[in-house]
């Protein structure tokens, strides 16, 4: 992605990572500076890095205990191997978050900063102001799933995409593609595939409603 050509994608990432930390009335949000959005995003990523590393350390410790308990039982060895694999995945996740922490300030500096700030704040304001409608739309298409049971990052990606499609006049295909690309960066394979499926059901429902 060329930062100069993709200010809206950078804005989406900042909005996604800032949603839990940037709150207040529309008037207060209008006063938020771009640097505050960047700091909020980095704090979110930092928290995720710490959580991933702590969980990874716990998995390694548990795997060592299994190995010490019995070096010959196949079930213990297999269990320990699984724990180590999970710890490695968590560590890789932390590394990816650290990379994003380094990249975000640079991307913002190289982009149209005014456009990034304005669109990030527009997304945040819309998600908060239209929260009930957005969540009702998602609940309608999420058969056998509850929004609040999803990982927070996945919930917020869905909220932003629906806000863009319904209230910010972003073409549905663009909103879905952008959501999936961001999910590939901040979620896992299962997460981005699930997000893609949910958003496609949203577009189908919107098209059906439009024909009535």
Curated annotation (Swiss-Prot):
Its taxonomic path starts at: Bacteria, Bacillati, Cyanobacteriota, Cyanophyceae, Oscillatoriophycideae
Spell out the family assignment given in the record's similarity comment: Belongs to the NusB family.
* Superkingdom of this protein's organism: Bacteria
- Which keywords are on file for this protein? RNA-binding, Transcription, Transcription antitermination, Transcription regulation
Set out the biological process GO terms recorded for this chain's protein. DNA-templated transcription termination; transcription antitermination
What does the UniProt function comment say about this protein? Involved in transcription antitermination. Required for transcription of ribosomal RNA (rRNA) genes. Binds specifically to the boxA antiterminator sequence of the ribosomal RNA (rrn) operons.
- Output the Gene Ontology cellular-component terms: cytosol
- Designated name of the protein: Transcription antitermination protein NusB
Q: Which GO MF terms does the UniProt record name?
A: RNA binding
